[in-house]
UniProtKB/Swiss-Prot annotation:
GO terms for molecular function: cyclin-dependent protein serine/threonine kinase inhibitor activity. This is Cyclin-dependent kinase inhibitor rum1. Regulator of cell cycle G1 phase progression. Ensures the correct sequence of S phase and mitosis in the cell by acting as an inhibitor of the cdc2 mitotic kinase. Probably interacts with cdc2 to inhibit its action until the cell mass for Start is reached. Determines the length of the pre-Start G1 period and prevents mitosis from happening in early G1 cells. Required for maintaining pheromone-induced G1 arrest. Acts as an adapter protein since interaction with cdc13 promotes cyclin proteolysis during G1. Induction: Expression increases in nitrogen deprived environment, which is important to cause delay of the G1 phase of the cell cycle in response to nitrogen starvation. It comes from Schizosaccharomyces pombe (strain 972 / ATCC 24843) (Fission yeast). The keyword Nucleus applies. Keywords: Cell cycle, Nucleus, Phosphoprotein. The gene is rum1. Residues 1-25, 43-118, 188-230 are annotated as: Disordered. Residues 101-230 are annotated as: Required for activity as a cdc2 kinase inhibitor. It is found in: Nucleus.
Amino acid sequence: MEPSTPPMRGLCTPSTPESPGSFKGVIDASLEGNSSIMIDEIPESDLPAPQVSTFPPTPAKTPKKQLLPNLMLQDRSNSLERCMEEDREHNPFLSSSDNQLLSRKKRKPTPPPSDGLYYVFRGKRIKKSFRPGTDLSTFKPKLLFADSAPSSSSDNPTSSVDLNDYSQIGILPPNLNSIGNKMFSLKSRVPSSSSGSFVAPPPQMRLPAYSSPQKSRSNTKDENRHNLLR
């Protein structure tokens, strides 16, 4: 197979419209035919489409003086700088505190307007409204247990005891059972004493004497020894 020689420069070589060599051949042929032709006379249809760059545009390298012309760069080493002037009109730290600093006041919450009463039942706030003109001062809330329990009766002796009468504290009613009456009679015999001193109970309330476990064990040992000697 013979090696193919590359085409000569300046000659139009056949190529496909998609290949970049077609546009190069058109320009070379036009330059050879008329050397005084200008590039501007080439129709735009023959120019290649500009390639779209996928990279972000590079920032313009513009000096800061042109970007911010109003910004004045001052030399901090210059000792002849103009000192800052105090603005006494808008500076609260340089003026009187009575005019600028206001005293803090606690906000008093205003109660919402209401034309009824509020109840709290099982953690929920319930409002009960009344007709306008109703005197709420005479209104009494309903009792939680308006009716008495069925087990209670009027024969209960404690129902007649006044809880506000402190003189009745410690006195048992006489119509209790026999044990209560006995304890009530023994209580009346005990002399009154201060709360700090100890008073021995009467003989009727004392426990009967009993033998200690050590003494009972020693008695059983002696009995067993006596039985063995027999």
